[in-house]
Amino acid sequence: MLIHIQDDILRLQGMGLLEPLLADRTTGRNILWATDAYLEHGSRFARNAPITTALITGEYAGLIRTRARKAFEQQSQRTKARAEVFTPLWVVSQMADYLDEVWFQRKAGIHKQYADGHISFNTNKTWQQYVENRRLEITCGEGPFLVSRYDAATGEVIPLEKRVGLLDRKLRAVSENTDTVSDWLHWAVKALRATYGYEFQGDSLLISRINVIMSVWEAFETRWGQAPTASQLRKAAEAVTWNLWQMDGLTDRVPYARENLQLSLFDLLPDAKPPLPPYCRIKNWRQQRTNQFRSLKGERTRMKFDFVIGNPPYQDETIGDNKGFAPPIYHLFINESYKIANTVELIHPARFLFNAGSTPKAWNQKMLDDPHLRILNYYADASEVFPNTSINGGVAVSYHDEQSSFGAIQIFTKYNELNTILRKVVGHGPFETMEEIVYTRTSYKLTDKMHNDYPNAKDQLSNGHAYDFASNIFDRLPQIFSDDLPNDDHEYYRALGRKNNARTYMYIRKEYINKTANTDKYKVVLAKADGAAGQIGSPVPARITGISMILGPNDITTESFISIGSFEVEAEANNAMKYVRTRFARTMLGVLKVTQELGPQKWKYVPLQDFTPNSDIDWSQSVADIDRQLYAKYGLDEKEISFIETHVKEMA
């Protein structure tokens, strides 16, 4: 059976509870739409306009729908704006189970124990304490972590006994431990008052409020065999409007509220700044007082959440001029979550675990060095969690507990075998990294001499990239290249690049390109990105890199390639190329290669070898034999060797 939110809306309206559920306790007005998804219906549906009963009933009945019922175009628009990905029920269940394991200090989630009878509490962990445990879902959307009335992907109703949300679990405890209606209502309200969520968009917030109040309704009806009355739900509705509030989680303010603020005479002065939206207020029910939400971030605050859980927005596509790039914002929500609770469990992109992606490198390292952080689950293929969604680097469920020390992650891989290999390799003598001899794809640059000789060249290049020896430079500036080595008085480099989607060589005057440390040396060359090569585990086995080749002195490359080494003799370059082709080296490269890019930093854990005749490796052997020498050098056992040879494809 599918959920029908409109039926809930009409039922609540008939009981006089719909209007109260539209209240914004901070502004004293109604919650705002905070989305342009309904603008086609007129200005009353603008993002800064209030949601009223008249706009969601009568002629507009059916306008508010769950995610599963929304028109495809609306889903697409909303998903793009803040890169929403909707949390599947099984993920909600796993994450909520873990919070219960932490609270109960025992294995198995609360709902699993319910199938065998009542939830087991004791004198140290009472059901009343469980009910009053303060838990918050950030950016809650329709509230999947709070209540699971239906499957968010399909809209199918979930039977009460199989629901797994935070409030579902509390209401279950209330039903099992109370004997009268009045006692049940008393503790159900306490459960509500200790369950929180905030959301940016008004329609989603309204749905989450409806889901919460209707979950109380359905739990009451199941326990007592009759529907609750309006008066019995009045306190519950009040708690819902305080505890589920509208907020921009990055500013702690009511979204778009300043567009509704009346201007004072002072505001009309020429230099006056527009008023900012008000900071959101929430209620501390234990002290019967309200606080600005931002005050919870202070060290001396009297109110903190016991647990924070959620699935924050991943990126913001509403800002910036680059249509191909949307800045990440999930790390900002992580930072803010750590300020309001000692214990935080979130699902989010995992690229930072490999010090990759667009989150700040300093932030990535801070997270990797944090002894209070652990990764509960890692999914290299994000579509395992979010169908039809591609997230480079995968997604992770992280758990942060300020009062526990798990040891810093420092280096993350999802495979135990790779972790042990990594420890052996890094701990083998004084570790030197291959990263030191890898040259970035942007090593070569055009010169002022070229621009002086070809003053119109700048107009043929991208803005801000007048000196880039770009991947498409052969097509962009054909006038500075020759197919064959010219017979004139100038000196030339042979440049490897791509033309008409194929590798090719062209000649360019030396004075048009800067010289690097390996320009006049032998070097190993690889494509700077190779999506088909894959990563460890995707596919199995994976190549990790493309095919390497040797370039000699006076050979250079466009930005399509990286180069490795600066060798005086070709034999050493050949030895390095053999090493790059080993399964061992590509496995170590795979520790940090979670996207198709192969920049120098990805080679951090590939150990540098001696490529001269004095090496402890006999480079005259085949690549397969060199692999065996490397396995022995680093003391790898059969299980570790088997992991490498099953996960990384052989290269001759």
Protein language model regions, located:
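SAM-dependent methyltransferase catalytic region
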Residues: 2-375, 381, 403-407
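C-terminal effector/catalytic modules and regulatory tails appended to multi-domain proteins
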Residues: 31-37, 613-617, 640
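C-terminal substrate-recognition regions of SAM-dependent nucleic acid methyltransferases
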Residues: 78, 82, 90, 299, ...
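A structural signal for short hydrophobic/aromatic patches embedded in well-ordered alpha helices
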Residues: 95, 208, 576, 644-645
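Short conserved catalytic/interaction loops centered on acidic-Pro-aromatic/His motifs
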Residues: 221-224, 588-592, 641-642
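Short, amphipathic C-terminal "tail helix"
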Residues: 639-652
